[in-house]
Amino acid sequence: MARVKRAVNAQKKRRTVLEQASGYRGQRSRLYRKAKEQVTHSLVYAYRDRKARKGDFRRLWIQRINAAARAEGMTYNRFIQGLKAAEIEVDRRMLAELAVSDPAAFGALVRTAKAALPVAPVAAEGTAA
């Protein structure tokens, strides 16, 4: 049976891991075992944070929309409710962009949302609402 030589493959594997670990501090960029552990962990972080980034941006957009809506005298919750009632389908990313770059257009959307909201009945005095 022929002898199997794997030195080239092993060296290539180690070189690849050490290249991925370049820029890390200390042993994590120089020693193969430490570098392999750190590269694996880094890839896990990268995967997790790619997923988390989507939620982070959504939270940022909601904060921007809420701030702009409150400047117009309306809360975020009522604003979104009014947009749904007016059958306006604009995603939060575009609403946040409008709030930052074109406040006049955002104000028009707020007025439309206010007009579409039903007026809440006023509770009679002395009764719990």
Curated annotation (Swiss-Prot):
GO molecular function, one term: structural constituent of ribosome
Gene Ontology biological process: ribosomal large subunit assembly; translation
Key words of the record: Ribonucleoprotein, Ribosomal protein, RNA-binding, rRNA-binding
This protein's GO CC annotations: ribonucleoprotein complex; ribosome
Gene3D superfamilies: 6.10.160.10, Ribosomal protein L20
Family according to the record: Belongs to the bacterial ribosomal protein bL20 family.
PANTHER family: 39S RIBOSOMAL PROTEIN L20
UniProt function note: Binds directly to 23S ribosomal RNA and is necessary for the in vitro assembly process of the 50S ribosomal subunit. It is not involved in the protein synthesizing functions of that subunit.
Protein name: Large ribosomal subunit protein bL20
Native source species: Kineococcus radiotolerans (strain ATCC BAA-149 / DSM 14245 / SRS30216)
Name of the gene: rplT
